[in-house]
Amino acid sequence: MPLDDRKKKILYAVITDYIMTAEPIGSRTIAKKYNIGLSSATIRNEMADLEEMGYLEQPHTSAGRIPSDKGYRFYVDSILRNYINNDPPISYNTREEIIAEFDEIVKKYARILANITHHTTVAKMPKLNPDRIKKIQLIPVASNKMIFLVVTDTGIVKNYLLNLCQNVDRTIFEFLNNLLNEKIAGKSEKDIFEFLQQDLRQMLGEMAFIADELINTILLSLKQLQETDIYADGTSHILDFPEYKDLGKAKNFFNLLDNKSLLNEVLEPEVDFIDVRIGSENKFEEMKDLSVIKTTYKINGRVVGTIGIIGPTRMDYRKLISEINVMTKELSNLLSSIYNDEI
């Protein structure tokens, strides 16, 4: 059932107050502080309806209400609708003549964003020159198992254990090693994808049953070789929130920031605009009490990385969405002007 204007006003009032105070809010407080034009009793009934609909929660029977993840989502979606075709009403004088390494420029902007927002910011650095596979070696360890060894042109070595659905004669490993090195070693990602999709199964002939394992492993190795560095700034800001005065909860947050592999997935762009994940919407259990606001930065329209803000679900979404929108646009413009002829 869609929310009428009265319920929307009450929901926005609860969210606004909770963002500022971190305390449950009751109907009398809303009636006094917000010019909604309704009695406390009417507001109480509407809040009960909002709770039944899943937009509000009551942490204790005697307490007021707080927003649920569904309530935050409704609030955020209404904010994002205003940003689709409009620039935010604020701007920062952050452009300057910069001669620096690419990563340092991105880190500078992430640092500025952390200082402005008083939140933890994370940035996914691009790999402009990804490693290429120099050599592949398949090593049999059992009749239905092999080690898939990958060596890159920069000396990185990765190995994977493949479990096959059928036994494989050891005599075919020389053929497989020669085939994969001829078709993959030193080749571009585009050429490798074409080989995997169009030619590999046909070339394997009777051994096509191992094609899926080989393809999945090669794609996984390519993905891992392209994984980027993660930079975090403003990590101590989380301690400014009452929710994280608890040492156990704070420790879990800092452990999360140390998990670069998880953050790499969290920052993977899913839409070409500002993306907000609220509490339970995050797929990782470690993120269930947190919200993430992320967006991409670009060079001449090409996405090269992601910047995100991480904090408790009780964050000022309107302010943070505005600020990350401005900063990533500034960063994209600066990078495009500096690296116009290089990328």
From Swiss-Prot:
Superkingdom to which the source organism belongs: Bacteria
Keyword field contains Zinc-finger: no
One biological process term in Gene Ontology: negative regulation of DNA-templated transcription
UniProt keyword list: Repressor, Stress response, Transcription, Transcription regulation
Name of one Pfam family that matches: HrcA
MF terms in GO: DNA binding
Family: Belongs to the HrcA family.
PANTHER family, alphabetized: HEAT-INDUCIBLE TRANSCRIPTION REPRESSOR HRCA (PTHR34824:SF1)
Biological role stated in the UniProt entry: Negative regulator of class I heat shock genes (grpE-dnaK-dnaJ and groELS operons). Prevents heat-shock induction of these operons.
Name the UniProt record assigns to this protein: Heat-inducible transcription repressor HrcA
Gene name for this UniProt entry: hrcA
